[in-house]
Swiss-Prot record:
Glycosylation sites: N357
Domain of life from the UniProt record: Eukaryota
Organism: Sus scrofa (Pig)
Positions on the Extracellular side per record topology: 67-68, 127-138, 206-216, 341-367, 421-426, 501-506
Molecular function as annotated in GO: D-glucose:proton symporter activity; sucrose:proton symporter activity
Name of the featured protein: Membrane-associated transporter protein
Name of the gene: SLC45A2
Amino acid sequence: MDESSGQPDVHTYKSLAEDGPFCSVEPPKRPTGSLVMHSMAMFGREFCYAVEAAYVTPVLLSVGLPKSLYSVVWLLSPVLGFLLQPVVGSASDHCRARWGRRRPYILALGVMMLLGMALYLNGDTIISALIADPRRKPIWAISITMTGVVLFDFAADFIDGPIKAYLFDVCTHQDKERGLHYHALFTGLGGALGYLLGAIDWAHLELGRLLGTEFQVMFFFSSLVLTLCFIIHLCSIPEAPLRDTAKDTPPRQAPQDPASSSDRMYEYGSIEKVKNGYVNPELALQGGKTKNPPAEQTQRTMTIKSLLRALMSMPAHYRCLCISHLIGWTAFLSNMLFFTDFMGQIVYHGDPYSAHNSTEFLIYQRGVEVGCWGLCINSVFSSLYSYFQKALVPYVGLKGLYFMGYLLFGLGTGFIGLFPNVYSTLVMCTSFGVMSSTLYTVPFNLIAMYHREEQEEQRQQAQGGGLDSSRRGQGLDCAALTCMVQLAQILVGGGLGFLVNVVGSVVVVVITASAAALIGCCFVALFVRYID
């Protein structure tokens, strides 16, 4: 706060990508190879997600985690992500690192993912090597493993926002659409490969005997894939850094209407005014006569309170998109998090609570294995569908894709719940892939279109001498969408267990997923705003 004027501190940043004043520079068209390299981060992330889905439950059970702490493991990560996601998204909008705004955050979160995997896949081995007291070993093993799971989930959920914002910053609108389709394609391929490797019995293979256990084998593959994918991703497309121009320019006169300035300070997204290449157009200064170059960014000193107020004041069409994303992820996670358990108990009629050498438990394990193959089918079909999405858009538009994704998933899960047959269930897993591809592409395409429309409006206002008052950074908008994933995890983790206990059967899981998806159909058709 400046004591002499009573106004909040204001810093101005300028993108090194632009030189001329009053001109908005369109990023160059990106070759397919660069977009594929950019998508490798999604491949690596989803590969590690699949490994976690296949191994985290056996790992937690092997270290003796009490059932009372099981829900804590799955709730801690989304709660932390929901609270911190917008903060990091906003901070990345005005990061001044020399190699860009998004890549430093992506690198840090990638390292956190690697550390989380190291802890939850090797926690028991680490503790056995460090602690000799058998009475202390279980407590430390549980603590280390839980920390690893929470850290990995937190970073893996978190990283989606900066990756999407990175794509939006450096690409034209057409390349953004292409990039999102490649993201969905490689997300499915990464998940499929992760599930396939998780289905192999490494204990009876030479590599398993060499590394010790199948947990160490999967850590070897996961760390190798994740490291290579993120190196390729970070080298895919250069980012233009922001530089601080406050030291190079004389102080400006304070606005004549401080109250108006104070009100704008808490508008949605007003905590950062990013002008980095294609991200934002011309900026008209308050006062009317002087304009900043379009590559400038005005950043006010922010607090958590101001950030929350900014998010609460988001425009209606952004809010509706976030709600539809929340409904979609609630439906999707309701099914995916409990699908293998549904296969073991309902489809195969096994019993997870019986003795481990009993026929009922072995049948349950067989159902879980087949459920993993169903998730593999989901990943493969997600990749295929993401490829065909580009061909479908000219005919049905984004509205048709959004509606169709929710509808097919709702009908597919409903059919599985009503007719729990092995073969029909595996066939219906293709509808999971449609929903997955839809959630990873359409909402972010809409965000890109909203920003493109706002850029055109702001450019027209700047040419006409008007005042630009509705600027947002794409990092914050992507983070707001990603927050809905964490909120959906909180709702599913806290609510579905209660429903299962009340009903007495896990069939309520797929019925809930179906109902939520069909409600989402109505919402995306009636309330989400689409741009032709």
